């Protein structure tokens, strides 16, 4: 029975949520940049819900495969054979033969014993980091690790220790302060999703060997982009054998949805039977699985896609530098255009959109307040001419708002 003497919890929740005002403030200024509906595929030129067409420089489809006819055909064939859903967990009735086929291909691709797929990339990190964060152990996180890694660490039993971005001196100091025989897991992004730089994996591996730690690389933004055949950061450095766990997602270069973790057989077996976001979630849909599998084939068969991606990437990086932009230390198709002011960044996004360029703002807490930026992302399907058009328009906007001179 409802007790009238107790506070109205719904009202309290509403009051707490009402204290969040940033979105309303931005809407009042008419510079709200989120939830813009698109009514076409993620191609270089997309059609918005209002019928307008804009150049897309905000997508993670690095190889331009998300609208590829071959992936669509694979997805359609899978739906016809398996239906639209597996209607259950991988642990129970939700394992298909195409799941296992994809996992075998992924393990070979990244050079590991085995792989297991999850229904989203977020669930991979949530389930793996929490599961391997043993009681009495330690998890070491880079300050710019993705939110799902941070959330996974919060669900673990381990003590979490953060270190400044790519600061190996601080990481070593923190490792030195932990018991040598305690479980230690270092988790880093391979390619950092907001600023585009690459983790110093050689030094991390060296520290792992010195302090008896393991390393997990979230290669969501590295797979398809760097390494042999696009096999990622560990391959890029020639450190596949010394990288304990490699995580990847299918929503970027693979043009699908889902994720995976690959590693030694005993670790993957443990995760299969203990990772909660795997066991208690429905499995990847047949369509997503088939599309990811076909994308992996194309990734290997068509290196020219990656070569062109790097051609437009190098061109864009040089063009922005020559125009006076601060693009940080990017080493990838993710180019940060630092603005360092939240409202100004959102104003830039609106002005660019009105001129036919779709870009995205990155604000706190995704980055520190003084590192607010515009994320400019390239695809293998972009042309040099499209890049030049976007750079020209953004240069004029940044100068008008006095971000660059």
Q: Where are the regions that the model predicts?
A:
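N-terminal "arm"/small-domain region of PLP-dependent enzymes with the aminotransferase-like
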Residues: 2-6, 15-84, 213
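Conserved N-terminal alpha-helix of the aminotransferase class I/II PLP-enzyme fold
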Residues: 73, 77-121
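Active-site phosphate-binding strand-loop segment of PLP-dependent enzymes
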Residues: 161-217
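Active-site PLP attachment segment
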Residues: 229, 235-270
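Structural motif of enzymes handling amino- and sulfur-group chemistry
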Residues: 283-302, 312-314, 321
